[in-house]
C-alpha cells in the first residue's frame, strides 16, 4: 500500500495474524519496531504480554485474531496521524467483515477512539461493552501501557474476564474461541 507516506518507510506490511474464524478479535494501534521487522502484529514485549493475557483466560493466541488500526509502523513509534487512520481504516473494516468476530477487544486509545468514533479517554471507556457495527466491543488498556503502568493489570484482567464470560455464554459455543 502506498496511500500514505508510511508505505515508504516501513520494512514490512503488518496486516494481521490468527484464526480467520476467530470469535475474538483484538485491535491495537500500529506496528512497532519488532512488528515491522517480523511482519506480524504484537510480537515485541507488548505482544508477549498480550499472549500471556490471552493464555491467562484459558485460550491460545492461535485461537484469536490480532490486527492493528495502522498496517505500517509510524516512524519512531509516534502516534498515528488522523490522515493515516482515515487511509488505513478500510483495511481494518474489511478484516472485521471477513473474520466476523463475536467480540472485538480494542487495545488502547487509538483503537478504541477510532472504532467508537469518540475522543473519550480509555479510562472512561474500558470495563464495559460498547458496540462497533453491531459487534460487542470491550475497550481495555494496551499491553504497552501495562508495561509502563503494571498497577493497571488488574483492570485489564477484569475486562478480559468479562470478554471470556460473554463468549462462554454464547449459544452453540464450543471449547475453542
Regions found by a protein language model. Give the residues of each.
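A polyanion-binding, active-site-adjacent surface
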Residues: 1-177
